[in-house]
A protein has these predicted regions:
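Sec-dependent signal peptide recognition
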Residues: 3-10
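Long, charged/polar, soluble alpha-helical segments
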Residues: 19-149
Length: 149
């Protein structure tokens, strides 16, 4: 039993460390994303990571948003998470899937013509999906959904 408890403690430590390392990197370094789309995405995902870590203490979501912000800082053309990534309740899947499909249909032209609103839509759809998966903070769900729309 003592070995089990020690292994559980070690596993917990490494799990928490892995969740917070990208968040710490995001907040302890300066970044200069190479283009306006990447800069908008970086700023929006960093804001979401900070909210999830500092206000909600949701380290899994903070990790996801931190990793996306760090990728955006490198100029990677971030897309929203595939809807299958999330465990969204059945009654909300159709609406979010439609939003995802619509966003992906305008992704390439929006990169050129409207990078700010594209970045907002991508980060808001991830936020909406993440909050809908949790399915209990209606204010947060509606806030993310309204930001997307």
């Amino acid at each position: 039993m003592a070995i089990y408890n020690k292994l559980l403690l070690i596993f917990t430590f490494f799990f928490l460390y892995s969740c917070s390392s990208s968040y710490e990197k995001l907040n302890n370094a300066n970044f200069s994303p190479p283009d306006s789309f990447s800069k908008h995405l970086f700023d929006m995902y960093k804001e979401k990571a900070n909210f999830e870590a500092e206000k909600m203490h949701d380290w899994n979501s903070a990790k996801l948003y931190s990793e996306k912000a760090l990728e955006a800082a490198k100029g990677v053309k971030i897309q929203p998470e595939n809807i299958n990534y999330w465990k969204i309740p059945n009654e909300h899947q159709t609406q979010i899937k439609l939003a995802y499909d619509n966003l992906m249909s305008i992704y390439e032209p929006a990169l050129i013509h409207d990078p700010y609103n594209l970045a907002n839509a991508i980060s808001s759809l991830d936020c909406w999906s993440e909050q809908q998966e949790e399915n209990w903070q209606t204010w947060d769900i509606n806030n993310c959904k309204d930001s997307f729309l």
